[in-house]
Regions:
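Eukaryote-skewed repeat-based solenoidal scaffolds used as protein-protein interaction platforms
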Residues: 194-197, 217-277, 294, 298, ...
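Hydrophobic membrane-insertion alpha-helices, especially the h-region
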Residues: 10-27
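Aromatic-lined carbohydrate-recognition surfaces of secreted/lumenal glycan-active proteins
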Residues: 90-91, 205, 230, 234-257, ...
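Substrate-binding cleft of secreted/luminal carbohydrate-active enzymes
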Residues: 26-97, 309-394
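Glycoside hydrolase catalytic-domain groove-lining segments
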Residues: 131-150, 261-319, 364, 372, ...
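Alpha-helical scaffolding within the catalytic cores
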Residues: 96-105, 127-134, 186-189, 251-263, ...
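N-terminal substrate-binding region of glycoside hydrolase catalytic domains
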Residues: 60-182, 315-318
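Substrate-binding cleft of extracellular glycoside hydrolase catalytic domains
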Residues: 133-245, 392-393
Length: 394
C-alpha cells in the first residue's frame, strides 16, 4: 500500500508538471521557439522518464533474473538470426501506459518473454519517432524489442521537407521511399537505432501483398517498388552503421503473389506471419484450427530458408474452444514446424483494425488458456523456460 501511494504521488506530480508544460507552451505560442523550447522539451522527456521508470521500477531485478538464460544470447546477433530454441514474445496494446499487463502475463505463463512488440507508424509526431524510451524499458526488463514499423506517409509536413503536394501521399509511396524522398526520417530512425546500442527486431511494412489493409500494399505500389523501398531502408541503416537491426519480412500468404515482394536474402533475416483465428465473429470468417492457419502456410514460407516467426498469435472465443485451440497449437510446434523459432502472443483487447467493432484477442486473464499453454511448454517442448527461475516472477 505504501509503494502504491508513492507511485500515485509520483504519477500525480508528473501529470501536473506535464499539464503545466502544456499550458506554458500555449501561453508562449510562437515565442517558445529556440532555447526555451529545447528546455521545455527536455523537461517533458524527464517527466516521461520519471513516469516510465516508476511504472516498471521494482520489477526489473526479478524479471531479469528469471530471464538469465537469455542475458548472453540477446547480445549475440548470430544466435538471434537463427536461435536454437523458440523465443516467445507478446504484444499488449496497453504497453503505452505501462508494462504491468506484460509482467502479469509472465506470471500467468510462469515464463518471462524474451521479445516484446510495439507498433510505430511513420510520421513526425512524437509517437512516430524511434521509441527510445520503450526500447530501453524493454531491454531493462531483460527482453528485446520487436518494432512493427508501418510506412504510412500521411503525417509528414510536405512543404517543410520539399515533398510534392499530392492528394494521396501513399499512392506510389514506396517508389518515393526508394528514391530517398523520406531519408530525412529514415536516417534519424537509423541513428537512434544505433544509439540504442542493443539488438532490435524491425518488422517493416507487414502484409505488403494484402490489397485491402495497408497503403503500402498493391493498391498503391508494384512489388518491385516495395522491394526497392525495403532495400533502400535497410541500406540507409547500414550507411548509418545501425547493424544492430534484425529485419523481419512478414507477408500475408493468404493472398497470392507474396513471393513477388521478397526483398532478397541479403535484406531479410526472418520471415514472419500472423496466425489469428477470427472464429465466427464475421460473415466471412469461420473457426479455423492452428493447423489450418499456420500449417497451411508453413511449407510455403519455409522455402525462403529463414527462421520463421508468428508475429501475431491469437484466437477469439466466438465459435469454438479457445483453450483447446492454443493447446493443440503448442502441442504441435516442436515436431511439425521445426523452422518456427519465435511466437508472439497478440494480447490486444481493443482491436478495431478489421471490423467496425472492437475485438478482444487478449488471453491475459484467461486462466484456463494460460495454464494449457504453460503445461504444453513444459511437457512437450525442449524450451528454455524449463531452466528459468520462474518463481521469481511476482
Amino acid at each position: 500500500m505504501k509503494n502504491k501511494m508513492k507511485r500515485m504521488a509520483f504519477v500525480g506530480g508528473a501529470t501536473l508538471l506535464g499539464i503545466a508544460l502544456v499550458l506554458f507552451f500555449i501561453f508562449l505560442g510562437n515565442r517558445s521557439s529556440g532555447p526555451i523550447s529545447e528546455i521545455l522539451t527536455t523537461l517533458g522527456n524527464k517527466v516521461t522518464d520519471v513516469e516510465h521508470n516508476l511504472l516498471i521500477r521494482g520489477r526489473i531485478p526479478k524479471r531479469v533474473k528469471a530471464l538469465h538464460w537469455f542475458e548472453n544470447k540477446r547480445n549475440n546477433p548470430d544466435f538471434l538470426r537463427y536461435p536454437d530454441t523458440l523465443l516467445l514474445g507478446v504484444y499488449d496494446n496497453n504497453y503505452i501506459k505501462s508494462f504491468d499487463n506484460i509482467i502479469h502475463f509472465d506470471k500467468m505463463l510462469k515464463a518471462p518473454l524474451p521479445l516484446i512488440q510495439v507498433y510505430v507508424a511513420w510520421g513526425e509526431k512524437d509517437n512516430e519517432k524511434f521509441p527510445m524510451l520503450y526500447a530501453k524499458a524493454i531491454y531493462d526488463l531483460g527482453s528485446l524489442p520487436l518494432i512493427t514499423w508501418e510506412p504510412w506517409l500521411n503525417d509528414f509536413d510536405r512543404e517543410k521537407h520539399h515533398l510534392p503536394k499530392v492528394t494521396d501521399p501513399n499512392k506510389n509511396g514506396m517508389k518515393a521511399v526508394a528514391k530517398g524522398k523520406y531519408d530525412f526520417y529514415i536516417e534519424k530512425w537509423a541513428e537512434n537505432a544505433k544509439a540504442f546500442g542493443h539488438i532490435i527486431f524491425i518488422r517493416l511494412g507487414h502484409e505488403m501483398n494484402d490489397p485491402y489493409r495497408y497503403p503500402w500494399g498493391p493498391q498503391n505500389n508494384k512489388p518491385e517498388e516495395f522491394i526497392a523501398a525495403w532495400q533502400h531502408v535497410v541500406q540507409v541503416f547500414k550507411n548509418r552503421n545501425a547493424y544492430n537491426v534484425i529485419w523481419v519480412w512478414a507477408p500475408q500468404p493468404a493472398y497470392l503473389h507474396y513471393k513477388e515482394y521478397y526483398p532478397g536474402n541479403r535484406y531479410v533475416d526472418w520471415v514472419g506471419v500472423a496466425a489469428l483465428n477470427y472464429g465466427t465473429v464475421a460473415p466471412w470468417s469461420k473457426w479455423w484450427s492452428f493447423k489450418e492457419i499456420f500449417g497451411n502456410y508453413y511449407n510455403r514460407l519455409a522455402v525462403f530458408g529463414k527462421p520463421l516467426m508468428i508475429t501475431e498469435m491469437g484466437s477469439l472465443t466466438v465459435g469454438g474452444n479457445r483453450t483447446q485451440w492454443f493447446k493443440q497449437a503448442f502441442d504441435s510446434l516442436p515436431e511439425k514446424y521445426p523452422q518456427l523459432r519465435s511466437v508472439l502472443f497478440f494480447n490486444d483487447n481493443n482491436d478495431n483494425t478489421t471490423l467496425n467493432k472492437s475485438l478482444d484477442w487478449s488471453i491475459l486473464y484467461d486462466t484456463a488458456t494460460c495454464k494449457a499453454i504453460r503445461t504444453s511448454i513444459r511437457t512437450t517442448w525442449k524450451f528454455s523456460p524449463e531452466k528459468q527461475e520462474t518463481d521469481t516472477i511476482r
